[in-house]
From Swiss-Prot:
Belongs to the cytidylate kinase family. Type 2 subfamily. Keywords: ATP-binding, Cytoplasm, Kinase, Nucleotide-binding, Transferase. One of its GO terms (cellular component) is cytoplasm. GO terms for biological process: pyrimidine nucleotide metabolic process. This is Cytidylate kinase. HAMAP family: Cytidyl_kinase_type2 (MF_00239). GO terms for molecular function: ATP binding; CMP kinase activity; dCMP kinase activity. SUPFAM superfamilies: P-loop containing nucleoside triphosphate hydrolases. It comes from Methanoregula boonei (strain DSM 21154 / JCM 14090 / 6A8). InterPro entries: Cyt_kin_arch, Cytidylate_kinase_dom, P-loop_NTPase. Its EC number is 2.7.4.25. ATP binds at G7, L8, P9, G10, S11, G12, T13, T14, S15.
Length: 182
């Protein structure tokens, strides 16, 4: 089974992906973690690294191509990333997580150890803007078009365990009556 988990920064995609990976024993690959690691390796903030990636498409395309290649050759995998629902066309279940910006910013401040919410907001909005432009330019993908997703969940009011239970119900149903991936 191939599952993609996508959403904007701070929506909980990495947490849910880890949960599902542990629960089902699936391999997990994460574009966000790869991107954050690359930024760190270049001694850059995420927004700064995003601007670099905006100038040189090789960064995004390398991460995206690698994820797609691994996912399409693998079974029992969770592919986490903003574009994974678009890139992994043969996924059995494509999930989009969303949460209001205030919720996402609180999570980002904690996760990335940013000094305050206003700083996190500036960084996050710039990052989202840069990414949206790149996705449109590179792949003609509108990140706000969720039509490829099978399951869209608001992560604001549920913790990862509760979200995991909702997704588990979908996975269990798919195991009973699989459908052709769209």
């Amino acid at each position: 089974m191939r599952i993609t988990v996508s959403g904007l920064p701070g929506s909980g995609t990495t947490s849910l992906s880890r949960y599902l990976s542990e629960r089902y024993g699936f391999t997990m690959i994460s574009a966000g973690e790869v991107f954050r690691q690359c930024a760190k390796e270049h001694n850059m903030e995420l927004a700064e690294f995003g601007r670099l990636a905006e100038k040189d498409p090789a960064y995004d395309k390398m991460i995206d191509a690698r994820q797609k290649e691994i996912a399409e050759k693998s079974d029992n995998i969770i592919v986490e990333g903003r574009l994974s629902g678009w890139m992994v066309e043969n996924a059995d279940l494509k999930i989009w997580l969303f949460a209001p910006i205030s919720c996402r910013l609180d999570r980002i401040v904690f996760r990335d150890q940013i000094a305050d919410v206003e700083t996190a907001k500036a960084i996050t909005l710039e990052r989202e803007h840069c990414e949206a432009i790149r996705y449109q330019q590179y792949y003609s993908i509108d990140i706000n078009d969720h039509s490829v997703y099978h399951l869209i969940l608001n992560s604001e009011h549920w913790g990862v365990d509760d979200l995991g239970k909702i997704v588990a119900a979908a996975i269990d149903q798919l195991k009973k009556t699989p459908f052709a991936a769209s």
